[in-house]
Design a protein with these regions (language model features):
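Short alpha-helix immediately C-terminal to the canonical SAM-binding loop
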Residues: 58
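SAM-dependent nucleic-acid methyltransferase catalytic core
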Residues: 1-13, 21, 66-178, 182-191
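Short loop/helix-cap segments at secondary-structure boundaries that form the rim of catalytic
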Residues: 39-45, 168-172
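Short beta-strand element of Class I
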Residues: 47-49
Length: 192
């Protein structure tokens, strides 16, 4: 299963292992949602809530939940090539609306080496030694992936509050909380 976003600290590769170790639960809380790799890989719980303070993440998932906005975003992505110039422009552009904002967020996320919210970390390209240009393939798969992600989010409550407040609000016996806070910047490579 692929995630839509190449988010820092993504658990995409280890999500199956994490889910295998989760106890049975009625309600599920992910107070540090990021790219959502764990939620999108697990079976739905009766009540699910995700949270992220990053307005770009919240906007992206808000856009794909709305049919008209999702279709506009899919068209925007369908006609946006995998391009260094578009990637560089994504850091300079002032989006016209939430759909374009979500589109540029996707460009910055999926066309970069290691997406950072605060700046360019290099356009990702495949040169040799691989079966195909995976970066381009994942980019071209994105518009079609949005529909299943929107369907999965249809049953999910999306918050944008301090995580500790949500942890306190959801502190009940039948609630499973998947807590994966962001990395402390000083512990990341180069402090970035």
């Amino acid at each position: 299963m692929k995630t839509l976003l190449n988010y820092p600290g993504s658990k995409r590769r280890i999500a199956p292992w994490i889910i295998k170790h989760m106890p049975a639960h009625h309600s599920y809380l992910e107070p540090y949602f990021g790219g959502g790799s764990v939620l999108f890989a697990k079976r739905p719980a009766a009540i699910e809530t995700v949270n992220d303070l990053d307005g770009e993440v919240v906007n992206f998932f808000r856009v794909i939940r709305d049919l008209e906005s999702r279709e506009r975003l899919q068209e925007w992505l369908d006609y946006t090539p995998y391009s260094r110039q578009i990637y560089e422009d994504a850091f300079l552009m002032e989006p016209q609306d939430d759909v374009e904002r979500a589109g540029y967020f996707a460009v910055k996320s999926l066309q970069s080496h290691g997406f950072r919210m605060n700046g360019d970390c290099g356009w990702k390209k495949d040169v040799h030694g691989r079966e195909c240009a995976y970066a381009v393939r994942y980019w071209n798969d994105l518009p079609g992936s949005i529909a299943w992600m929107a369907a999965r989010l249809k049953r999910v409550q999306i918050e944008s509050r301090p995580a500790l407040d949500l942890i306190q609000d959801f502190n009940y016996e039948n609630v499973l909380m998947y807590l994966d806070p962001p990395f402390v910047l000083s512990t990341r490579s180069g402090g970035k």
